Amino acid sequence: MRLSDLRGRKVAVWGTGREGRAAVVAIAAHGPADLVAVDDGGSTVSPPWDGFLATAAPLVTGDAGAQRLAAADVVVRSPGVPNTHPWLAELWRRQVPVTQGTALWMADHAARTVGVTGSKGKSTTSSLISHLLAAVDQPNVFGGNIGVPTLDLPAADLYVLELSSYQCSDLTDSPRVAVVTALFPEHLDAHGGEREYYRDKLNLLAHGPETVVVNGADPRLAAELGDRPVVRAGTPDTTHVAGGPDGTPWFHLGDQPLFPRAVLPLVGRHNEGNLCVALAVLDVLGVDVLARRDTLAVAVAGFQGLAHRLTEIVDPSGLTFVDDTLATSPYAAMHAIDAYDGRALTVIVGGADRGLDYTPLRDHLAEREITVIGVPDSGARIVAALDGLPKVRCDVTGDLVEAVRLARRVTPAGGVVLLSPAAPSYGQFRNFEHRSEVFAQAVRDTAG
């Protein structure tokens, strides 16, 4: 379904955040017979609905909103509307077509788009792809989940999008190059279960992309994709890390060395994998990666890591404090822990409790000497899951500030204090930015 298909139709836009606002502006320009906006009360942070928005799409709330959705020819939902929402189940029962702004946009722009998703690494990888393309004279527009809604993007010859599982779920067109960085259970409450989450995430690949690029080291991706023909970044046939001319790790394309691993300023093997995926995407887009390796090395060296993703905080004590507040699952926390392998490490875990299974984290730490400090709400349950591991020291504190204070006392000189919560921020904090702010302030307040 394209935007132009909405001409003369009764359309309801469900959600009044930035995606809903972009949808109203775009749809209004295509002459729907009727256009309304529906707010189900699930968000309290949307700014006022006034001016052009109120004129083009009057706002309806409560039970009246549910009725307007059911009466529409097409419903355009915001990504924040979960698949488990009871109103959505009723729309599906009535066979009311439901789509999203990203799906409408993709129908017109798929052939010019690189779409990146993944349970972890999609923001960094999509940012790297856009950054490296620009460095080799391939101008592009970057947006999606990480930035500007797709329906607000300007005209361009090439787009790079970060796409969430929610945005992927309603796609009926795949981008020219579909990219998946990692796959593990996430957002299960919104998708209805693990299988449903994988289905929605991998819907990015379901509609005939020209090329699929994946992290070839991810076992779940390998299992889900089977023998499907894909480019498996991180394997010897394509972009990967191996010993280089000087004996240190280098990025390679096949058997050809590109530049040293040390050029990449981001820590962790998972970030090596993210860059391998990005370089593989450039390769399939026709960039002569080998010929442009010097230019790419300079661009990689200048890449600034994204906030709240293994962001190191300077501290006069000699300890390294690390903000990885966006690690909202045990698998993401495991990647962060691995990034500081070989250093004395204290990790702070806990947040909103979604009932996740922390057995994988326990297995990962079975032979690791580490201190784990739990904070509400799920911190005590995570710590309990680690009970009995001989090399893991565990504590539980009442809040994040107390956890930082304790971490200072128990972490050896030169060690790392890592906030990698393995849980979302809501409940104790307004959002992940607020959790990050509280952590950084606690580091400052407890210094000296």
Swiss-Prot record:
Pathway: Cell wall biogenesis; peptidoglycan biosynthesis. It catalyses: UDP-N-acetyl-alpha-D-muramoyl-L-alanine + L-glutamate + ATP = UDP-N-acetyl-alpha-D-muramoyl-L-alanyl-L-glutamate + ADP + phosphate + H(+). It is found in: Cytoplasm. One of its GO terms (cellular component) is cytoplasm. Keywords: ATP-binding, Cell cycle, Cell division, Cell shape, Cell wall biogenesis/degradation, Cytoplasm, Ligase, Nucleotide-binding, Peptidoglycan synthesis. ATP binds at G118, S119, K120, G121, K122, S123, T124. One of its GO terms (biological process) is cell division. InterPro entries: Mur-like_cat_sf (IPR036565), Mur_ligase_C_dom_sf (IPR036615), Mur_ligase_cen (IPR013221), MurD (IPR005762), MurD2 (IPR043687). It is an enzyme of class 6 (ligase). Its EC number is 6.3.2.53. GO terms for molecular function: ATP binding; UDP-N-acetylmuramoylalanine-D-glutamate ligase activity. Its main location: cytoplasm. NCBIfam families: murD. Cell wall formation. Catalyzes the addition of L-glutamate to the nucleotide precursor UDP-N-acetylmuramoyl-L-alanine. Belongs to the MurCDEF family. MurD2 subfamily. This is UDP-N-acetylmuramoyl-L-alanine--L-glutamate ligase. It comes from Salinispora tropica (strain ATCC BAA-916 / DSM 44818 / JCM 13857 / NBRC 105044 / CNB-440).
